[in-house]
Amino acid sequence: MAFCSPHTTTSLRSPCTTIPNSGFRQNQVIFFTTRSSRRSNTRHGARTFQVSCAVEQPIVIGLAADSGCGKSTFMRRLTSVFGGAAEPPKGGNPDSNTLISDTTTVICLDDYHSLDRTGRKEKGVTALDPKANDFDLMYEQVKAIKEGKAIEKPIYNHVTGLLDPAELIQPPKIFVIEGLHPMYDERVRELLDFSIYLDISNEVKFAWKIQRDMAERGHSLESIKASIEARKPDFDAFIDPQKQYADAVIEVLPTQLIPDDNEGKVLRVKLIMKEGIKFFNPVYLFDEGSTINWIPCGRKLTCSYPGIKFSYGPDTYFGQEVSVLEMDGQFDRLDELIYVESHLSNLSTKFYGEVTQQMLKHADFPGSNNGTGLFQTIVGLKIRDLYEQIIAERAGVPAEAAKV
């Protein structure tokens, strides 16, 4: 486990340095106590906090969802919040499922399949079945990463359906495990600093799969229905129950603005946020704890049919107190999102309009005109804030000093 010792300094050339020490890396991270520039702090002798860590202990984030439910898009939004593009390991297996950015490493839990595609077919199990996955290895390796140790992680090749040779994964600042089972095994679940579940309703999932598999892959409607029905028992048994453990759930439902809509193009999206989670304060609309319905369409927000409706209020979810923010409808102009952003609180933004900026930056991503993109972006900002508060606590410095 990482050992961090804070001490004070009046000046330093670099805000973060790496110093060789007895065969391991020693990181020094500097936290300034005021928002003024580093130069003015030094000039006036203001104290800064310098934190020396023998090994940086990553925070671990879990993201659970069924296949084809937007995990990859969410990861692209999340890594963008922290800066730097997420790319496969350089010089590694071209079919690797891992993505690495400046601060974040994302691994796909499909890599812990214990059976290849042929093996699953022979045994009559799906990839959703725990019997087709190695949870002991998953736990051991996630635990090792959290302790700051490198691992040799297996690779499941989605192209060939085979188990490829392992790849070396170094501990990052933020380690994200995404896939079918991040919260299934209690041992793995307890390693998570924060967890998210993407809950796509059956109606929307079916509409999305038809759009993707018929239009892009040439599958018949009958084969799509058969595929969904074949997976449903295992999904209901092993994947869906994980949402009760998630700290935040993004639930995607059919719109209520269009009667009997079954196309899945206009969506109603809920951000369900647990109360009482350390370092996580739920986002709220207008007045925290109140029950509010808001139709923002008008002079400051362009809305074509069927319009936009926001709702917010307290609720219970699997017996736990939650706050729920809901958006039904879609944006016509993303630049006008700033009007909505200005009425939301606890966003954990660095500056006014950061949510809107992130949404405009990735306007071509799926869901950018509705609540899926908006709430994924907000959760990404909340995870950044959570990371900063965790490292501040570990270093023994004020939380404000860790803001970057």
Curated annotation (Swiss-Prot):
Pathway: Carbohydrate biosynthesis; Calvin cycle. GO terms for biological process: reductive pentose-phosphate cycle. Residues 1-53 form a transit peptide. Keywords: ATP-binding, Calvin cycle, Chloroplast, Disulfide bond, Kinase, Nucleotide-binding, Photosynthesis, Plastid, Transferase, Transit peptide. InterPro entries: P-loop_NTPase, PRK, PRK/URK. Signal peptide: none annotated. It comes from the Eukaryota. It catalyses: D-ribulose 5-phosphate + ATP = D-ribulose 1,5-bisphosphate + ADP + H(+). This is Phosphoribulokinase, chloroplastic. It comes from Triticum aestivum.
